[in-house]
Amino acid sequence: MTTSHRPQLEARNGAKNIEYIPTSTQHARLLPGHKEVKYRNTKKRVLNRKVESTPSEEAKKRIKITGAEECSKDEEIQATDSSDEYEEEEEESEDEEALLEEWNKVKQERLDKKLREQRAEITAAQNEEVTKPQKHGGWRSNTVFGRKGTVNQSASISEHNSNGKGKYVNNITQSEYHKEFIRKHVK
């Protein structure tokens, strides 16, 4: 049987002790985790909007007292406000159009720059391929101990030794093979 992964505050295995007295000690894992229900914020917002949208008692009294005169004044004020809002909306839409045009220009410039860089990389790679004749003899031909075998290789070894290039070096980081490998493959 497995445990319930809860600490045993009073171990109950073994013989039952008559003098066993349970204590009032409680572990945090034995307590309930949640005691309140959480509500979504959207419901609170909807409730707040409903409360705000209902006309207050003061507004109702004011309408009854002042009558139609103030209502007509309010309508005139709202009409002027709506014309101001229309002008502001036009200005905002013009500003948005200008910003969109600038954004499109910036995007186009970035695209052109990327294309130029890619073309430059491609042409550079093609130039390297043309200028450097690819002579791939394998990695064994460059190693010190991989040159054993044929007479032609022994002749090439003596040529390397006379140049001072193919000498055996005890330190691998100082060997010509290592230097050539780093030059070719690590940039």
Curated annotation (Swiss-Prot):
One of its GO terms (cellular component) is catalytic step 2 spliceosome. Its main location: nucleus. Keywords: Coiled coil, mRNA processing, mRNA splicing, Nucleus, Spliceosome. Residues 49-60 have a biased composition (Basic and acidic residues). GO terms for molecular function: RNA binding. Residues 72-131 form a coiled coil. InterPro entries: Cwf_Cwc_15. It comes from the Eukaryota. The keyword DNA repair does not apply. Residues 82-100 have a biased composition (Acidic residues). It is found in: Nucleus. The keyword Coiled coil applies. Involved in pre-mRNA splicing. Belongs to the CWC15 family. Associated with the spliceosome. This is Pre-mRNA-splicing factor CWC15. It comes from Kluyveromyces lactis (strain ATCC 8585 / CBS 2359 / DSM 70799 / NBRC 1267 / NRRL Y-1140 / WM37) (Yeast). The lineage of its organism: Eukaryota, Fungi, Dikarya, Ascomycota, Saccharomycotina. The gene is CWC15.
